[in-house]
Amino acid sequence: MESSLPQVAALDRSTLLKAFDETKTGVKGLIDAGITEIPSIFRAPPATLTSPKPPSSSDFSIPTIDLKGGGTDSITRRSLVEKIGDAAEKWGFFQVINHGIPMDVLEKMIDGIREFHEQDTEVKKGFYSRDPASKMVYSSNFDLFSSPAANWRDTLGCYTAPDPPRPEDLPATCGEMMIEYSKEVMKLGKLLFELLSEALGLNTNHLKDMDCTNSLLLLGHYYPPCPQPDLTLGLTKHSDNSFLTILLQDHIGGLQVLHDQYWVDVPPVPGALVVNVGDLLQLITNDKFISVEHRVLANVAGPRISVACFFSSYLMANPRVYGPIKEILSEENPPNYRDTTITEYAKFYRSKGFDGTSGLLYLKI
């Protein structure tokens, strides 16, 4: 009898997940319904909720880099290259200020994502889908049916480059802003990839010529206030499967980066953007730049809004093969990974979900 209990529990969980998904109202729908306790499908394994705090030291805050001028003169350029290379190598995360994207564009992007998630439920349901190939998708937890616990957030996402959605496919609340903001992020990304190329000792356009800047996936996240934030997470520990990610976050906070086995807070800085190295950049730089794990805490305050832009073609057809850059390999620095395509890696990454392990282990030699 006892041996059948796990099967019964799994069946019950599957039923609950299906029922939640079929509402098409996401986590916000639970809050709108007035819940005071989180459903069991959101209860995270206790081990994933641990929060070892770093020593009280400035050494445990991610670097902030001033991009003012974009390194147009040689002295400033060398300084920027050194700072960004150092941050990508030691932290995998950094914030940028004076990045060239106007404050009003940042604010309108945050407001647009909020308006989408808070609009009439029936309108929002029209965008609900679990098809990753869709041009425009609203859902809650892409790995809902495979993860140990669901995350406390809802997401609107679309590819905005190289082929943005048709105007008629965009949400009225934020569609135009998503396209405008993406264009600004693409310009910033081009500069960052140039600086990262130079930090590797390569030609300025090396990473661009590898098509690292060609595709952009934009995800607008909505983290509703949580009645029991100590029992769940806004986003489970994971690393990104991109080349580079640029994140816009509002004032609520909750993002943490794993550094030297400590969870380090990334406090919101007005006007700043958070940049992090993705798995694909770690792969092609042969571990020179690191893709580190990060997570988002649930919060009784909220909603928290963030907009993440991923430089990667993800599940879009892309036959190009990627492996460690040959120009940086040597006898002392042999390749650590086998070659792959973005599509192959993205499918593996999606199938494993946010299980707390690095997808790069799949490609290790």
Swiss-Prot record:
Residues 212-313 form the Fe2OG dioxygenase domain. Its cofactor is Fe cation. Signal peptide: none annotated. Transmembrane segments: none annotated. Keywords: Iron, Metal-binding, Oxidoreductase. One of its GO terms (biological process) is biosynthetic process. Fe cation binds at H238, D240, H294. Gene3D superfamilies: B-lactam Antibiotic, Isopenicillin N Synthase, Chain. One of its GO terms (molecular function) is dioxygenase activity. Belongs to the iron/ascorbate-dependent oxidoreductase family. PANTHER family: 1-AMINOCYCLOPROPANE-1-CARBOXYLATE OXIDASE HOMOLOG 1, OXIDOREDUCTASE, 2OG-FE II OXYGENASE FAMILY PROTEIN. This is 1-aminocyclopropane-1-carboxylate oxidase homolog 1. It comes from Arabidopsis thaliana (Mouse-ear cress).
